[in-house]
């Protein structure tokens, strides 16, 4: 009987040790999930910050686009279709000629090509906005003097007109003159009527003006002496 009792005691000790070990392991196992949840929360916060910054950037871009749209007025002068023959066949593309201006002395034009008409217009608008130039005009809304613009085989004559005359022009010339802000001018096409060359010739003419101050500096005189 004594031998049997001695054999039972080691079993109780082993069970106590296993209980202690099993009691310690669950604590360790519970500690790791807490650390993981904390790291997950930190990652989610960082992702939320990134998403908020991206959304704010997109909002700023939309605001800038709205400003540019409200700032400039646009006119589509011509949309033409272009075909190109290759080994694989014919490829169709479209070109768009667009003029933009604020009717306050700033005007520009752009021409672009794309596979679709809307994309060609968007590209042309961006080019036109980047190529905006400041145009000189007097307080009556007309030119200071006669100008002759040239581009290729196109020649455009532009003259100042008295108030109330209006814009005597048509086609591509009218689009440029109107969006520049002129209200009374005479124009005449003296060459070929290719739209792109007419636009360039008109821009060449209205940007080659001399204001009274510039003439006074060239002649080394004051404005009163002129």
Swiss-Prot record:
Residues 24-54 have a biased composition (Low complexity). Part of the 30S ribosomal subunit. Contacts proteins S4 and S8. The N-terminal domain interacts with the head of the 30S subunit; the C-terminal domain interacts with the body and contacts protein S4. The interaction surface between S4 and S5 is involved in control of translational fidelity. GO terms for molecular function: rRNA binding; structural constituent of ribosome. InterPro entries: Ribosomal_Su5_D2-typ_SF, Ribosomal_uS5, Ribosomal_uS5_bac-type, Ribosomal_uS5_C, Ribosomal_uS5_N, Ribosomal_uS5_N_CS, Ribsml_uS5_D2-typ_fold_subgr. It comes from Mycoplasmoides gallisepticum (strain R(low / passage 15 / clone 2)) (Mycoplasma gallisepticum). It holds the Pfam family Ribosomal_S5. GO terms for cellular component: small ribosomal subunit. The gene is rpsE. This is Small ribosomal subunit protein uS5. SUPFAM superfamilies: dsRNA-binding domain-like (SSF54768), Ribosomal protein S5 domain 2-like (SSF54211). Residues 1-71 are annotated as: Disordered. One of its GO terms (biological process) is translation. Residues 72-135 form the S5 DRBM domain. The keyword Ribosomal protein applies.
